[in-house]
Structures are given as structure tokens and as C-alpha cells.
Amino acid sequence: MTGSGAAATLKAETNDHHRRAESSPFQRALVAGKLPVDRYVGWLEQMRVLYRVLEAELTLAAVGDRYAALLGTRWRRTPELLADLAHFGRPAEPAPVPATDAFVGQLARWGGEKSAALIGVLYVLEGSTNGSRYIARSLRKAYALDLAGLGYLDPYGDAQTEEWARFKAAL
């Protein structure tokens, strides 16, 4: 499974999960710009915890691995998450909530044995940047923010379409 075949397979395999996630009360409030800012920042903190582990595991998996070329693309989100958290005066190393802790434990297990599962997680997170760009616009108004505080949601700016195409081609 390579290239667009991998992207098509991942899209099909994650479609039901994607629909459920989009219909969750949290996601609906986020998209509508009605999520309280402290809940948004708490979510950023948990994404920081997730990316801390995911980035470490994918970096280890890429050493001599078939995914090394894919992982050469700009997928890391630590810089944006750190900047967003700093904007809101939050710590760079937040503590995980139980659900995040359980998920990052699973990421660590996959890193040791199933790097393809990590690529699936990365596919979902990278794919989410397509819609998160619109969420950033909504939150810009709702929270009276400029770019500061929204870097994680809009990491590529106007290059979003090209970056997503590059990522899928590298799969």
C-alpha cells in the first residue's frame, strides 16, 4: 500500500470515526466558536501531550524505516503548540488527563511494534488540518485573537492544500 492507495485506504478506514468526532458536542461547539476559551486551551494542552509522544515515536520509527520519506514532510506541531500555549500563559509541558494518558500509552506501544499504526494516527491529525483552518477563522472572531493562539489550527496558512497533497503523495 503506497501513495494515493494508502491515503484512500486510510480515508475509508477512518471515515466512521471522523463522522462521529465531527458530531461530538465538543467539536460542534469548537467549530461554532462557542467553546469556552479555557476548554479550547485545555484541548491545546492535551494535543501538546499527544504530539510530544507521537513525535518521539515517529522519529524512532523513521530510522531506517519505509516511512522515513513521509516523515521528512512538515508534520511536527510542537512549535505551534508551544507558541499557542505561551500565548495563553500555559505551561509547555502540561499534564495529561486520563483519556490522553491512555492514548499516549497506546502510541508508545505502537511505536515499539506497529509503526504503521502511528502513520494512521498521523494521517488523521494531518487530515484534520484541512478543516481546522476554518475552525481557526471562527475562533479568531469568538476569542478576539489574531494568529497568536491559533497556530496549531492553521499551521500551513495559504499553503494548506499543497501541504496536504504532499503528505498524501508521500504515504
Describe the residue ranges of each PLM region.
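Metal- and O2-centered redox machinery and metal/ROS homeostasis
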Residues: M1-L171
